[in-house]
């Protein structure tokens, strides 16, 4: 039996989300259909609002609804340290930890030649430009996931930064190989930041 077209379209839309297969998408579609109309309207407005109002900070690449994100525009942050993360959700994880008060740079991905993702596809060039324009930065912390792609990206960035004589460090043990930063608890992240090592 085929679903009516509007439901089929909704199932297809949900299946575009990462990790959502046909069964989950179908369940979500029927749940959405049973929601009060106001909740559905609020949900759709939230989707449109996030697409219209959220953009990348021109300095660090974090997501923001302002011209420049709150972290970059905060003069009380440590201007001598930049932590490089893969995604905004990783930045949020470190902010929730509350132990790091420096700046960030969000790559929005990692190098993955198999997937056709090279240096031009992620936010590396702007990091190098940022470092060239800012003499205050003394350390760059590469806080990337411990995956082959994360490791190769860290090494690539490290080689680009070395000539600038800026200290480049990597998060310490505490994050197991293959683990994602967003799922690590605050104690693990704190130990990783405190025990970072030079590259």
From Swiss-Prot:
Q: Where are the zinc fingers (C4-type)?
A: 57-72
What region holds the Toprim domain? 80-176
What Gene Ontology molecular function terms does this protein carry? DNA binding; zinc ion binding
Q: Which InterPro entries match?
A: DNA_Rcmb_RecR, Rcmb_RecR, Rcmb_RecR_Znf, TOPRIM_dom, TOPRIM_RecR
> What are the record keywords, sorted?
DNA damage, DNA recombination, DNA repair, Metal-binding, Zinc, Zinc-finger
Tell me the domain of life.
Bacteria
Gene Ontology biological process terms from the UniProt entry: DNA recombination; DNA repair
What SMART domains does the database record attribute to this sequence?
TOPRIM (SM00493)
Q: Which Gene3D superfamilies match?
A: 3.30.60.80, 3.40.1360.10, 6.10.250.240, RecR Domain 1
Q: Which cysteines bridge via disulfide bonds?
A: none
Q: What the protein does?
A: May play a role in DNA repair. It seems to be involved in an RecBC-independent recombinational process of DNA repair. It may act with RecF and RecO.
Membership in a protein family:
Belongs to the RecR family.
The protein's name in its UniProt record:
Recombination protein RecR
Q: Which organism is it from?
A: Lactobacillus helveticus (strain DPC 4571)
């Amino acid at each position: 039996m085929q679903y009516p077209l509007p439901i089929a379209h909704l199932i297809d839309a949900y299946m575009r989300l990462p990790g959502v297969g046909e069964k989950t998408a179908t369940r979500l579609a029927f749940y959405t259909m049973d929601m009060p109309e106001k909740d559905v309207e609020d949900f759709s407005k939230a989707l449109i609002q996030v697409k219209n109002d959220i953009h990348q900070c021109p300095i660090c690449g974090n997501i923001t609804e302002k011209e420049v994100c709150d972290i970059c525009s905060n003069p009380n942050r440590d201007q001598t340290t930049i932590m490089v993360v893969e995604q905004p959700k990783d930045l949020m994880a470190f902010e929730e930890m509350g132990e790091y008060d420096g700046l960030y740079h969000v790559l929005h991905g990692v190098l993955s030649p198999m997937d056709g993702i090279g240096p031009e596809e992620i936010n590396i060039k702007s990091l190098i430009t940022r470092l060239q324009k800012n003499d205050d930065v003394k350390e760059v912390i590469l806080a990337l996931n411990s995956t082959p792609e994360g490791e190769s990206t860290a090494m690539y960035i490290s080689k680009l930064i070395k000539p600038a004589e800026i200290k480049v460090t990597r998060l310490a043990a505490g994050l197991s190989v293959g683990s994602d930063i967003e799922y690590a608890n605050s104690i693990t992240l704190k130990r990783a930041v405190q025990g970072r090592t030079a590259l």
